[in-house]
């Protein structure tokens, strides 16, 4: 069963910030990383529970893509994956998920 992928505004902002940052230093890397992030997130539509539950907040699931972490919620009732944040793994994550 296919789930709809919904990007929350903060997740869109995160992706735009990643693109802007990487484009300033590594233009080719920026397009590759964004393509990889979008492709992996799209796969959640077919297998939304393929990633682990985030240990600090079990409401979220966490997908690792290169050096980034995608935090999302699965709503089985309306068959939707809500992408909440896309963050660098090196950041202090709990403060970004509040």
Model-assigned labels for residue ranges:
Residues 1-56, 60:
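Basic, Lys/Arg-enriched alpha-helical interface segments
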């Amino acid at each position: 069963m296919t789930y709809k992928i919904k990007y929350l505004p903060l997740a869109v902002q995160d992706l735009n910030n990643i693109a802007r940052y990487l484009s300033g230093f590594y233009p080719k890397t920026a397009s590759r990383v964004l393509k990889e992030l979008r492709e992996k997130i799209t796969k959640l539509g077919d297998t939304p529970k393929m990633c682990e539950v985030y240990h600090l907040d079990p409401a979220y699931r966490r997908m690792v893509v290169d050096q980034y972490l995608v935090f999302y919620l699965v709503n089985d009732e309306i068959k939707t994956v809500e992408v909440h944040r896309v963050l660098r793994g090196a950041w202090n994550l709990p403060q970004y998920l509040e």
